[in-house]
Amino acid sequence: MRYLSVSCMLACLLLFIAVGAQAFENGASNTPDSWTQQVSPGQFKESYEGIGLTDDTKVYLTLTSRYRLRTNDYADDQDFYQYLRVHTDSVKLGDGTVRFAAFARFADDIDGDHKKSWGDDYYYYHRDALDTQLGYDDWAPRLYHGYAQFDGVIKNTVLNVGRFYLSHQNTFQLDGADASVKLGDMVEVYAFGGKPVSYYYDIDDDTVFGGGINVKVMEATKIGAEYVRLDVTDIEDDYTKLRVDQAIPNGNVVLEYTLLNDAATVNAEGVYEVAATGTIVTLKYEGLLDEVDYENSYVVNPLTNTLLAASKYNKYEAAVYQSFLQNFAAGLAYEAKAVGGKENFDNRDYSRIKGKFDIFGLPSENTYISFSVDYWDIKNTADSNDNERLQYGVQISQKVGRTMDVWAGTSFNRYEYDYVNDKRKDSVRSYYVGGQYQPVQYLSLMADLSMEDTEFYDDVDSSLDKNYTAELWANIIF
């Protein structure tokens, strides 16, 4: 932890080096690099004042500085990330409007390993994707999105041009164009095309093209269909989705059919609220209808999930969530998977039970306490015995006055698994504490500290048992 003083100094420095910036629509400072943060209460609050370009048009900027320290008795690693988000109000253009948006990141590894020799083991324990990218890109730049949206410039058409995430049945990230056209009040058609975006692969010759249709059959019924042609890493795939959304009294039902080449899956989900008691019931089903061989696509990139050899399977889930006595709520869910043929590492029979108990407004009005438990029972196969996993934890968050939020929590994970001819049980205990402070509308600060104590490295080196992470964020908003 010898870099802790550096962390404190850098946190202060962030307040002075950040330039003017402003808000985005979702009101949170999370980025694609921090979606895995275990602390959810600590989201930055943001204003929507903007900087005036004209009498009726503003530009909104947000500059977020992030420092991360990871350390144990074996090694230390310090990373610095700088995020910039910008968008404008809609500007009149012809018979419609145009607006612009961008989201970018720059980063550096303060004591990174990319300049060290392979014989210097000290620097390689924390090697990650940032270190790899810095090996060939100074400041590891990433453009998450940067596009112009033309709404109504072409009659009844919304057109996105640039880098963006599709917002149809798939959420592919593209460098290209996406056009949606309304054909009356009931029908919308769309088409898109361009190059897929990858931060890890060479995609010079890769392309993605597709289109779809949404039909509002009745007031409560919508049907959609989408086809995509993927030409990625020299593998050509046909990707088709059909979806039905049906609203019902106090709930909704979704049915979906997906076909990736010859492999088809069916998904169904229903949510219903019992009005008299406030009980929420959720039912889910997923089924792989075809045997998947190695001849099917196994593309590993932001476009599709990995699809390797797999047998047919059925997966079910049922959940219930109930609030009671004004300050309490409890949830319970059961999930099971049944494989119809040969099992492998990623496709095995299992059952799972998870539960949650929440307390709102006790002991004070702005207190939230949540207890959770998650148990997996993974069945044996021809090649392995049955395994178990147990996780439980508690999280507490508290608002302190108008300007501050604090939180703390702990979780425990126990894994039972086969190792050579031995059955092992290893555990991981995590603790975290953090806070968020917003003294004025244009400034928000966050700090989060976590510690992980694990048994997994006992046979390697006990100095790896305890790992610490410190996160410091500064958000300047105008």
Task: Enumerate the language-model features and the residues they cover.
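Transmembrane beta-barrel architecture of outer-membrane proteins
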Residues: 64, 79-83, 141-145, 174, ...
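Residues on the lipid-exposed face of transmembrane beta-strands in outer-membrane beta-barrel proteins
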Residues: 84-88, 145-150, 177-181, 211-215, ...
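Bacterial N-terminal signal peptides
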Residues: 8-18
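Transmembrane beta-barrel domains of Gram-negative outer membranes and organellar outer membranes
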Residues: 24, 62-153, 403-405, 448, ...
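Transmembrane beta-strand segments of Gram-negative outer membrane beta-barrel proteins
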Residues: 26-73, 95-104, 159, 187-191, ...
